Amino acid sequence: MKKKLNDVTLIAYDTRPDKIEGTILGMQKCLSRLDFASAKLLTDIEPKNLPDNIIWEYAPHINNINDFNLYVFSELGMHVETSHALYVQDHAYILDETLWSDRWLQYDYAGAVWPIVENSYLTDDGKRIRVGNGGFSLRSRKLMFAPRVLGLKLEQRQGFFNEDGNLCVYHVDKLLKYGIKYMPVEEAATFSYENPVLENNYGNMKTFGFHRNHRENE
């Protein structure tokens, strides 16, 4: 019998025609492993033959990566009624449901550990941030609405707007003062994989989920 996460909404957002089928498949893989309060696919046009266990909700067309990042940064929470959402993509979904821990719901944000890269993932005062990647991420409603509540703007750095960088690095001090809790690096290494780092035994450790770059550890 599958475990049900009553406080978690499974959610994905993509409007690119060549990605919709894969996104639905990624959601179905998650739903085959765990049950959720609901599963929502956000697109600009309702897909034909959408599985009955996935709810369609309108979200604006993505013209470029900046459109995507702005919507996830400031609007994702409008689609979530539960305390948390698990954000997934066509290349980011659950691998091993047995690794899920209800303890994770104490955190407002969880994502894969970022590698140590010179001049990257640094706050303005030079603090290095390791958590984390937004492609497969657990987010609380408090976190999702924080940009609206605090009046945070999506900042452009490294040539484009990245919503996870804004939430975890650029605005981290304001969000910490607001009470946002980020998953510690050691737990994040079990939560999700994106890049080989010391904390995940350079990719040789099983993880709950992944974002890109990973063979399925099934």
Features from the language model and the residues they span:
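Conserved donor-nucleotide/metal-binding helix-loop-beta segment in metal-dependent transferases, i.e.
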Residues: 93-125
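Short beta-strand-to-loop acidic/aromatic patch adjacent to the donor-nucleotide binding site
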Residues: 82-94
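Short, solvent-exposed loop/turn segments at secondary-structure junctions
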Residues: 15-18, 45-48, 61-63, 91-94, ...
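Catalytic core and acceptor-binding pocket of nucleotide-sugar-dependent glycosyltransferases
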Residues: 129-218
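Basic, ligand-binding patches in group-transfer machinery
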Residues: 60, 99, 153
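Short glycine-/acidic-enriched loop or helix-start segments at secondary-structure transitions
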Residues: 51-52, 96-99, 148
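N-terminal anchoring/stem segment of glycosyltransferases
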Residues: 1-84
